[in-house]
């Protein structure tokens, strides 16, 4: 995205809401389809790091602000260098698998509240307890 001066800006695509010290909600918000891309990685990393270091949080629920879509796929239109240039995470893995492994090891209950299309959910959902109305 570009701002009024034409320079690139970063949109907040993943929003953290601390509902209480023990219960957090993470909302995916990248309309129209909730694609995940290189600009999302630092945002998710910040949240995963907070989950690892906060001793009070017990439950985190991942949901979507985009009606009909939970998480569809990786942004294949982004420059490949924007993803491959990101440094490995603390596990030594590339950023995305690093965060998924760290989420699976975190001492919190992680729930994916799915209300819509889930094309790319397998790697993400595998590391969460899956919750749905259906």
Identify the function of each model-found stretch.
Residues 2-63, 67, 101:
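Conserved CoA-thioester-binding segment of acyl-CoA-metabolizing enzymes
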């Amino acid at each position: 995205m570009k701002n009024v001066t034409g320079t690139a800006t970063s949109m907040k695509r993943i929003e953290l809401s601390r509902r209480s010290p023990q219960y957090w909600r993470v909302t995916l918000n990248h309309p129209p389809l909730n694609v995940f891309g290189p600009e999302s990685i630092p945002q998710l990393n910040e949240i995963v790091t907070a989950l690892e270091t906060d001793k009070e949080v017990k439950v985190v629920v991942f949901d979507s602000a985009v009606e009909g879509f939970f998480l569809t796929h990786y942004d294949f239109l982004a420059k490949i260098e924007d993803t491959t240039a990101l440094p490995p995470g603390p596990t030594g893995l590339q950023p995305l698998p690093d965060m998924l492994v760290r989420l699976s090891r975190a001492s919190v209950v992680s729930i994916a509240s799915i209300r819509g299309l889930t094309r790319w959910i397998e790697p993400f959902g595998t590391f969460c307890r899956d919750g749905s109305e259906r």
